[in-house]
Amino acid sequence: MKPNAASPQLVATHADAQADRSTMCFPLETASLTGRVSLALRARSLGLLLLILANGATAIAPQAPSTTATRLSMSITLDGKLDEPAWRDAQSFTLTQQAPSPGQPTPYVTEVRVLVGTDAIYFGFKCHDPRPSSVAIHSMRRDGDQSGDDTVSIVLDTYGDHRTGYFFQINAAGARVDGLIDDPQNISLDWDGIWDARTAKTEDGWSAEIVIPSRTLSFARGLDQWGLNVQRFIARGGRTWLRWSSPTLDSFLYDLSRAGVLVGMGALEQGKGIELIPYATGKSTRFYGVSPRSWLASEGGDLTWKITPQLVSVFTVNTDFAETEVDARQINLTRFPLFFPEKRSFFLEGANQYTFGLGLGQQFIPFFSRNIGLLDGAQIPLDAGVKLNGRAGKWNLAFLDVQTRETVVPLQVVQDLGLASNVVPGTNLLASRVSYDVNDNLRIGSIVAHGDPEALRQNTLGGFDAVWRTSKFRGDKNLLIAGWTATTQGDVPPGDKLGWGFRVDYPNDLVACQINMNQYGNGFQPLLGFLPRPGTRQTDVGCAYQPRPSKDGPFGWIRQEFFENEYTRVTDPRGILESWEYFMAPVNVRLESGDRFEFNWDPHGETVLAPFEVAPGVIIPVGDYTFTRWRAEAQTSGHRPLQFGTTTWFGQFYNGHLTQQENYLKWTSPKGKIQIELNTENDFAHMPEGNFVQRLWQVQAAYAWNPNLILTSFIQYDTESQNLGTNTRLRWTIKPGNDLFVVWNRGWQRLLTRPDLSLVPQTDLVAVKLRWTFRF
C-alpha cells in the first residue's frame, strides 16, 4: 500500500481491501526507467480500462431489504440491556456475512431492532459471540481509533437522495464515532453530533442501545422511508464483517444507493430547530524569558438555526479553539510544504460539503479552512462568523463568512513569511459551495473562495466540477468519472490562471484501477486553498489486483493479496519533466490472523531547478537525479492488546543514500481504560553535501474512567527543532452536548550551547473551557 501523507481515519467499516487501500494503483510508464516500457505499459493500462468499460452491461440489482421502526410508547432506560417490553415487541432483522466470505454463515449472529418516538430514534443490538471474553476493546475516546475493536455501525439516508447521510458507530465499550457521508467511498468523521449509547456484557456476547435525538439530524419532514444500513465488525480471527444490505465484497458501507429501507419515520419531529451553545474560557499563558504569566478570560457562543428541516445556519461570536488538539509533528525531506489536517470543530463540521472534484486529496484543496485563524502556526482571533449547510430540494448548499481580528504575530512568523510588519490586519474571508443532483448518478457543482489570510492581496477562486458514479456497473461494480476546472483572479503571479483535471476510478475488491490527470497553471494561486505544486501537470495511473486465496488451498493462511502498481508523472504545463515515481508492491499480504507484511520497489526521478535544504546545512544542488528506494513493512493485527509495526525505507536518495526507520508500539489494557502508544522515526542520510540524522519521537497515553471522562497526553520531540512539547487534555462530557475541557500545553527547548544540552522551559499554557448546549 503506497503511503499517504495524511493520517488515515481508522474506522473498521469495509472489507479488507477497502479498509487497507489508501490509493488505487495503476502503472503507465516509467519515464526514465527510461521510457522503454512506457508504450507497453500504457497500452496494457488503457486496454484494461477499455475492457472494463466495454463490458459494462448492467444487471438487475437485488431488492433492497426493508424493516419497520416500531412506534415507541414508553420510556427507554439507556443501559445497553434491551430489557424493556418495547424491545421485545419490536420487529427485528439479522445481519449477513459481507467479508471475507459473503453470504456464508458465522457464529456471530447479530439481531437489530429499531424504535422511533416523536423526538428520537433508538437502535438495539444483540451481538452473539461464542467467545465473549475475546471481544476486542482498545479505545474509549470520542472519534478514537476503533480499527481493532468489535463495533456496530449505522448509516442513515435521511433525505432519501441515496448520496448524503449520517454515520454512527460504537465499540463494545460504548465509545462513539460519528460522521457525515457525502461520498460512497469515504466519510468525514469531523462532525460531532449529540447522541448517546450504552453497552452491556451478556452470557453469549454483548448488547448495545443507541439513541439519536431527532434534533441532531436534518431530514425531509414527513418522509416516511429513510435509507438504512447496519454493520457489525469482529476484530479477531482475521476480521469479519456482517452487514444488513448489500453484503458483497464490492460494496461500501457509505454507499447509500446500496442501503436498505427503514419505514415509519414520517412522524419524527425536529422541534423549533434552534440550538444555543454558549462557552466560557479561562487561559493562563507564559513565555519564559519573554513575558510574565498573563491571564485572560473570554466568552462566546454559537447559535444554530434550522431554516428548514434540511438547511442549517450557524452564527458564531468570539470563536474559541482552546480545546483543539495539537498537530502531530512531521519530518519533511521534500522541497514542498507538508499537509496538516484541520482539527478545529467549528470548521470541521460541514467540511465535507466543500469536497471538490474526485480523488484530489492533498494535491489540491480549493478551500482549506486551516488558512483561516492560523498564520504559520500563530493564532489569529475570529471576531465573528456565519455558516450555512444543507439542502434545498436537489441543491446542496454550503457558505462560510468569517471576520478575523487585527493581531500582532511573533517575530518568527514575520521572518518565515517575509511580512512587512508584525501586525496582521483583520480581514473578511469567504467560501461557498453549491452543487446540484441531476439524477441518482450525476452531481454538478461550483465553488468560490475569496480573501487573503494575510490581508495583503486580493484573491478569488472560482471553479466547477462534475462527478458521475454508479454501483451497478457490470452488475454490481463501482465506477466513478469526474472532471473539474477552476481559475484564480486578483493579485496572482503572471501566467496561466487556470486549473483543470479529470479522474476515472474503478474501486472494487478484486481489481481496483484509476487514472487521474490534473494541471495547475503558473498563475493559479488559491490563497484560501492548499496547492503544494503550482505550475505543474500531474498524471497518476494505477492498478491493483487483490485476490483472496482459497482457504482449502496451499495459501489458505493468507486472507488477501494486493499486487499494486502506480505511476506518477509531474511536468510543467509545457510537458517538461519535473519528477516521476513508479511504485510497485510485489508482496503485500494480509494473513488470516490479521497480521500483514509488505515489500515495495519505488524508483524515482527528480529534476531540481533550484537548490533546496533537505536538512539543516545540507543543500541538494540543481540537477537531474534518478534513484531507487525500497520499503519493507510489517504490522501485527489491531485486535491484540499489544500491537507492533515497523517500516523501513532504504536505498538511494538523490546523489546519496537514506535509511528511514519508523516503528510503533501500542498497548491497551483489557477493558480499554488505559492506552499507551510510542511512535518513532529515525532518518540516517549519507550525502556528498553532508551527512545528517533526524529523529522524531511521539508518545500518546490515555486513561478513560468511561467514554465520557477521558484524560489524554501527547508528548513530542524532534531533533530538528530541538523542542519537547506536551499536550495534556481532560474532557468530561457531562452529558452529550455539554463538555468541560482542561488543557495544559508546555514546551521545552534544548540549548545546544550548553555543555549538558539541557532542556529549558519555553512556553506554558493552561486553559479551561466549559460549553453548554440548549435546544429548543
Question: Where in the sequence are the language-model features?
Answer:
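Short hydrophobic alpha-helical segments enriched in small aliphatic residues
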Residues: 5, 15-17
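Cationic, low-complexity basic patches in intrinsically disordered or flexible, solvent-exposed regions
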Residues: 3, 10
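Beta-propeller domains
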Residues: 406, 415-502, 519
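Bacterial N-terminal signal peptides
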Residues: 43-56
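Extended, hydrophobic alpha-helical segments in both membrane/secreted and soluble proteins
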Residues: 278, 297-303, 311, 317, ...
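Structural preference for beta-rich elements and adjacent junctions enriched in aromatics
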Residues: 59-437, 445-446, 456
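Exposed, low-structure sequence patches enriched in small/polar residues
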Residues: 381, 472, 476-479, 483-776
